[in-house]
Amino acid sequence: MIPGEILPGEDPVEINPGRPVRTVLVRNTGDRPVQVGSHYHFAAANPALDFDRDLAWGHRLAVPAGTAVRFEPGVEREVDLVPLTGARIVPGLRPESAGPLDGRAVRAGGAVRAGGAVRAGGAVVGDSPAATPGTTGATGDLPGYLGEGS
């Protein structure tokens, strides 16, 4: 064994076991690629991404920790989201989602989340009907994730 060496097991690793999953259709309406990290509050992602932000409220990408999903300009793709857990308080990030994720209304930086919609400047942000609820986690190939054997 080499000091610091990681010896992963043979079996696949289940990601987010037992967590409910939502599938959301996302389109990058901007002219530049957008990358969203694994634990970022997805409803607060770059405004150039068009998707149902209400459905994404309180959720993050269902991908391994430390990874990200890249959205190319003009391209649509489906992503799976899982609920943020723990205290469910978002520290900072974007003003429209900073603070507690649960409650009757959340206000920050001129944006309001009330009645199930994320509103900024009086307009609902995002409105995609293509979202479906689902159930739990995917499995991943840990050696592949660690960059071994690729």
From Swiss-Prot:
Pathway: Nitrogen metabolism; urea degradation; CO(2) and NH(3) from urea (urease route): step 1/1. Residues 122-150 are annotated as: Disordered. Its EC number is 3.5.1.5. Keywords: Cytoplasm, Hydrolase. It comes from the Bacteria. One of its GO terms (molecular function) is urease activity. It catalyses: urea + 2 H2O + H(+) = hydrogencarbonate + 2 NH4(+). Residues 122-140 have a biased composition (Low complexity). GO terms for cellular component: urease complex. GO terms for biological process: urea catabolic process. It is an enzyme of class 3 (hydrolase). It is found in: Cytoplasm. It holds the Pfam family Urease_beta. Heterotrimer of UreA (gamma), UreB (beta) and UreC (alpha) subunits. Three heterotrimers associate to form the active enzyme. HAMAP family: Urease_beta. PANTHER family: UREASE (PTHR33569:SF1). Belongs to the urease beta subunit family. This is Urease subunit beta. It comes from Frankia alni (strain DSM 45986 / CECT 9034 / ACN14a).
